[in-house]
Amino acid sequence: VEPKNTKEEFKYLYENVTVEKKGGYLGHPDSVLLKDGGILVFFPEGHGKGKTLSKISRDGGRSYTEEIKNPPKSWENSRETPTVYRLEFSESDTPDKLIMISGNPIWGREKSRGGFDCSLSSDEGKTWSEYESFFTEKDEVTHYPIVALSSLTRLRENGKFVDKWMGLFHERDFVNYKTVLSFSKDGKMMWTKPEPYFSAYRDIEKKSQMCEVECVRS
């Protein structure tokens, strides 16, 4: 609700914008600010699960008229809410990357291959890699993440930012896990074995049904 006497320069903050209209439910968007000022939005074609769709705004969010051209074929098989983050590097001359992630939870009685899928862009979202999957039923460690990753936070070591990012996700029993992303010398993604993040507070975590945790740097 727009407060009374709102200054004209701030009125746009209270405008409602329809990003997309399609048959059925659309929701759970996530967005990232592009270096040229554009806003790239991802959302599923369905309630939580469904083909990953995209829209781009070039006017500060007032309208969304573009979308990613020729998206990866694997995006059609997404099974969870997509999340997107910017990765900035300081330990190498690697340019920024964008990473989009979508989990593979168990939906009712539907079978799931588990794990989460990652797609990368090295050109500010113009082109993207096909999904690469981690912690699926074919791997030594299997998880069925819900909202992977609800948070992806760059880490520090000895007071300096390093090229590592801590991701969080949860499963149906409301256990929240952390896993750390890094890249090999040849640019391949590496994720550490997920570990329970709030094990010392499991009673609280379970009772409160803690989920979709966001980590904010203070």
What are these regions (language model features)?
Residues 1-218:
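Asp-box/BNR beta-propeller blade signature and adjacent active/binding-site loops
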